[in-house]
Amino acid sequence: MIAAPEIPTDFNLLQESETHFSSDTDFEDIEGKNQKQGKGKTCKKGKKGPAEKGKSGNGGGKPPSGSNRMNGHHQQNGVENMMLFEVVKMGKSAMQSVVDDWIESYKHDRDIALLDLINFFIQCSGCKGVVTAEMFRHMQNSEIIRKMTEEFDEDSGDYPLTMAGPQWKKFKSSFCEFIGVLVRQCQYSIIYDEYMMDTVISLLTGLSDSQVRAFRHTSTLAAMKLMTALVNVALNLSINMDNTQRQYEAERNKMIGKRANERLELLLQKRKELQENQDEIENMMNAIFKGVFVHRYRDAIAEIRAICIEEIGIWMKMYSDAFLNDSYLKYVGWTMHDKQGEVRLKCLTALQGLYYNKELNSKLELFTSRFKDRIVSMTLDKEYDVAVQAIKLLTLVLQSSEEVLTAEDCENVYHLVYSAHRPVAVAAGEFLYKKLFSRRDPEEDGLMKRRGRQGPNANLVKTLVFFFLESELHEHAAYLVDSMWDCATELLKDWECMNSLLLEEPLSGEEALTDRQESALIEIMLCTIRQAAECHPPVGRGTGKRVLTAKEKKTQLDDRTRITELFAVALPQLLAKYSVDAEKVTNLLQLPQYFDLEIYTTGRLEKHLDALLRQIRNIVEKHTDTDVLEACSKTYHALCNEEFTIFNRVDISRSQLIDELADKFNRLLEDFLQEGEEPDEDDAYQVLSTLKRITAFHNAHDLSKWDLFACNYKLLKTGIENGDMPEQIVIHALQCAHYVILWQLAKITESTSTKEDLLRLKKQMRVFCQICQHYLTNVNTTVKEQAFTILCDILMIFSHQIMSGGRDMLEPLVYTPDSSLQSELLSFILDHVFIEQDDDSNSADGQQEDEASKIEALHKRRNLLAAFCKLIVYTVVEMNTAADIFKQYMKYYNDYGDIIKETMSKTRQIDKIQCAKTLILSLQQLFNEMIQENGYNFDRSSSTFSGIKELARRFALTFGLDQLKTREAIAMLHKDGIEFAFKEPNPQGESHPPLNLAFLDILSEFSSKLLRQDKRTVYVYLEKFMTFQMSLRREDVWLPLMSYRNSLLAGGDDDTMSVISGMSSRGSTVRSKKSKPSTGKRKVVEGMQLALPEESSSSDSMWLSREQTLHTPVMMQTPQLTSTIMREPKRLRPEDSFMSVYPMQAEHHQTPLDYNRRGTSLMEDDEEPIVEDVMMSSEGRIEDLNEGMDFDTMDIDLPPSKNRRERTELKPDFFDPASIMDESVLGVSMF
């Protein structure tokens, strides 16, 4: 046996360090914690009797107490001897020298050295206790652990493995390295002394079964790393045994005369020693596996489970002959159902290491067939990291054996190339590429040097097109290209091949592309060019543009050069071939925006530029489709860059085209508007087609010099006068006139303008607004929607916001809509947005199209509502107009709830008091509508009245939890509500309640938002409206008054005012820490009084009168109404947005009694919608699988040396349910 080299070491005995690391005693009920693990012979504590200990190491002298000494190592570089824990914590010293020092200490006195090692593990767990020599001699492990448990600091939940900070950053890696180096340095002698390893394994096994999380976590990590180090030792022993056996066989096969008997005896002796050592290692590993792994791989703590799975993966990969079998793979398979993503992730990474080695595939066949479906389902895991690794694992499975995965399995992965999460999509793209594109037929080898249609990529490009069409997601070609960009760059950048497939005739016997396939190929080609030129993923993938490296920038420039050189020549040909196909032309016309325009000059390609401009002109003349015309306009815009010499050539072509269109339009318009003649359909079509072309170009180009406003105004005015103008002409005329105004404003803003320019623009804008206002009452809905949208844009652009940023010279352009225009805009919203959806469909065949049209219509209505709400938020229209919007909150919550809720939030940021008055106004409007419909003798239990109360409750929830912040607004809200309730006296006399008294029942929903002293003040104000007879009434008709009075008196006698009173315990917990600093505010609040009017008057001036002392705050001076978006960043304080500070879940708990009283409704509370992850979750599976699981674990049986392999029996099938589960688990679905 080879002994470790001895290093002379002198040990200094140090006093106990004062440094302790606190942790908490995190007791947890772990399944099986009280079970006595069956231990092998080496799992005993293995301590010798006191007499034997006295003889060991120090010559029979009594060892010093462990509490008065801590082991250290030699002084190095002037650093004094330190504890093992301190050295590992620092992570700076060479770990091997630290271990060598400890080995020398162990040789000198193994009890003291082991005591230091035991205290090392205790300290690494964050326990401040110390195991003394007395405890080590006379106490069992369980007693020591119980004693250490008592030493934990229960006020802290941290321990070294979980502590944050730079000093703990490398602790885990240093800790693991120490254990690995310790075993490696002891592998030739000390680990076989039946003392050191027995003691360490016994201690770690006991600690791993502790109820204290820190002990369990740290000891499990140590035991697993110890096991990994032992596996490495066992592997080395196996290799040495095989080598020894070969040497023995070679020597024995020699002729008798040449055979060395002494060498044979030495080899036999060596093999015997190695076999004994291997048996010892087997016993140690069995003890760790049975005592730690089989219990901790299903621990309640995810980190502990993850450690076990990670290490077993290492064992199977490192020593596959011993561990890569069904007996151990089953643990990984079971744990793939773990409820925590990090544990499932460890399972997948462990399996990846196995499937990556193709030599191990034969040992994984049974596991693959058993757990393949689970792996496939994990591609939809709710944790994206897990889904990515599952796809990568399936890619390795695919490479190992294509027959394993069925077509259905592959299809489950294919569709993930369209995932919005880029890592998932990229992994799926690699799987797709390996499956469909990586194989090459032998006959294609000769085509490697060919390009274009005859090149090797031609068939692959066709395959990509076929896949894209079969996936039926034709609007997402950019996502498909991005998914495959990293793994199939060469294929996707073979633009010569794509161009050849489009332009060249098919070879003999080759099937030509269909029209649908050509459209798909053009779309894919466009997406690959965009990806190469822009070097960032499409919208929705990635957080934004990243800074490119120098290599990426060079690749980008090279690609743009290739693109320009190829398509500058090919694009005119492609446009000529597909000039009548709107879809193909629209995509092809986007290519020039990715060109390097300088190459037109440097490459002498001007004639190809002229050909391109001719083709664009022809397309403009042929097409009237808006998408095609806008694509032509954008192409001219991309080519008209003044930085390049081609600008003049392109500008002349563009001007000639616009000249012809403008002249034609004026000529056609003159004939079209002639008095006394009815225009025929052909004239109308000519006017419309020309107007479409001009409008499309005016979107991207400044056409001010053609003075298009006058002719469009004339056209629109005639439409108003006659009322028979075709709707499409009106729509495009409105749009074109809108562009004229915007281009003039841009010109005035960017350059110095004259007063005449401002006045002309002001006049045109005012006249245009009047035109749009007239068209709001048009009979055609599409025209009205266009007029409304443009009018909202104009009002937003020319509002007071136009002067922001120091542009005071634009003040003459500010336009504020009058009350009639505001009324018409609001009426349009009420008539065209808040309408019932038509749910009946005419036929089953058209049901899908009908559903799509409904979604499209809803999207359009949402845009209309958002445009009007923007006017409210930016104070372009009066805030009280929002009352008609807010009152629809409940009825149309599913369609517009998010828009209305955001509008409430923004208006409250601008003016809390005015927002509160708007909310109460909306409730008053609903109340009046109910009175008009049902009369004053309505049933207060009716659904209509209950709906108004529910809406009031929702409004109350939106005020959040900070009552100080909303104090003024709530006070004003109650004031307006009280005045409304007593506004209409009963004609029958004072003995009968006021007509609107029932409104107090609705107003009581806001009482919980009043501060305690404000409730008293509001109560006093309420009494101003009450007569003596009213206070004595107890009939049912007076119940609203009694209910409201009681709501104001509730909590009035409390000595302690709580800003968040009424919250449940859960809500209080959420804000407990944040509520502490408010004590100072409370003292101020206690001294406040609400200023009351002297008489029972409803005037705001009396309500708002203030005394010189501190009063309950009421309506302050209205702040300057500025847009929340246009404000400077410093004005956008976090508290200005209550939506982000006060989650609605806490508000839900604020009034639990109201919830119970009302029962279930459409929305139980006013909280942000919880979007459930569409991906599957495997939560809850591990408990079901663990319950009743039979842990009849096997002994670790290392494979014999080659001379014994023929006697090895086959292992049983450990995936047989009978061998791993009892009857209670057989019915559990694994997938």
UniProtKB/Swiss-Prot annotation:
It is found in: Nucleus; Chromosome; Chromosome, Centromere. InterPro entries: ARM-type_fold (IPR016024), Cohesin_Scc3/SA (IPR039662), HEAT_SCC3-SA (IPR056396), SCD (IPR020839), STAG (IPR013721). Residues 293-378 form the SCD domain. Its main location: nucleus. The modification Phosphothreonine is found at T1112. Phosphorylated by PLK1. The large dissociation of cohesin from chromosome arms during prophase is partly due to its phosphorylation. Transmembrane segments: none annotated. The modification N-acetylmethionine is found at M1. Belongs to the SCC3 family. PROSITE patterns: SCD (PS51425). One of its GO terms (cellular component) is cohesin complex. GO terms for molecular function: chromatin binding. This is Cohesin subunit SA-2. Keywords: Acetylation, Cell cycle, Cell division, Centromere, Chromosome, Chromosome partition, Meiosis, Mitosis, Nucleus, Phosphoprotein. Interacts directly with RAD21 in cohesin complex. Cohesin complexes are composed of a heterodimer between a SMC1 protein (SMC1A or SMC1B) and SMC3, which are attached via their hinge domain, and RAD21 which link them at their heads, and one STAG protein (STAG1, STAG2 or STAG3). In cohesin complexes, STAG2 is mutually exclusive with STAG1 and STAG3. The modification Phosphoserine is found at S1058, S1061, S1064, S1065, S1177, S1178. Component of cohesin complex, a complex required for the cohesion of sister chromatids after DNA replication. The cohesin complex apparently forms a large proteinaceous ring within which sister chromatids can be trapped. At anaphase, the complex is cleaved and dissociates from chromatin, allowing sister chromatids to segregate. The cohesin complex may also play a role in spindle pole assembly during mitosis. It holds the Pfam family HEAT_SCC3-SA. Residues 36-48, 1071-1082 have a biased composition (Basic residues). GO terms for biological process: cell division; chromosome segregation; meiotic cell cycle; sister chromatid cohesion; stem cell population maintenance. It comes from the Eukaryota. Residues 1-75, 1062-1087 are annotated as: Disordered. The gene is Stag2. The modification N6-acetyllysine is found at K607.
